[in-house]
Amino acid sequence: MAKSRKISAGMLLFRRTSGKLEIFLAHPGGPFWTRQEEGTWTIPKGVIEDGEDPLDAARREFREETGIEPQPPFLPLGSIRQKAGKTVHAWAWEGDADASTIVSNLMRIEWPRGSGRFQSYPEVDRCAWFAPDLARQKINAAQAELIDRLEALLD
């Protein structure tokens, strides 16, 4: 199926531990992201395939990138537009997961760029739980709004 690179869907997993909110974020895999931290983490997300329901795409992408099956109910967080112009539709769900045991799908990329050599890397190399303020520092800047929206829904 063809994919639109300008529209994605994703899931923001959260939990409440001793009454405190924690946010589950994913760090992109591959050599380009190895040494990058602040502003690079993300909610598990990906492109919506033609004809695919955005919520179904968000659930599929979360499962592919983490090995975890999202469970309802899903809280709609609306859409955000990232710096490069991509729109991301997002939902939140409450659950728990051991971030150290995620299993991500693989992606093939040319590395080094322009070398003609293709290698496989996990799409997500690690996940972690963060307090909301630290999550806002770690996450892609445009996606920080999703944390704000989640907190507003939970208040």
For the regions a language model picked out, list residue spans one by one.
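Active-site-adjacent beta-strand/loop module that shapes the phosphate/pyrophosphate-binding cleft
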Residues: S79-G116, A128, L150
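A generic structural micro-feature
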Residues: K3-R5, K83-G85, Q119-V124
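Residues that scaffold the ATP/ADP-binding catalytic core of kinase and kinase-like folds
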Residues: R35, G51, K138
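Charged phosphate-binding loop/patch that engages nucleotide di/tri-phosphates or the phosphate backbone
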Residues: A128, P132-D155
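Short, charged/polar surface micro-motifs in flexible loops or helix N-caps
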Residues: S18-K20, G30-W33, E49, I68, ...
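The catalytic Nudix box helix
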Residues: T42-L77, A131
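Alpha-helix-centered segments that form part of catalytic cores
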Residues: R117-D133
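N-terminal strand-loop-strand
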Residues: A2-T42, W91
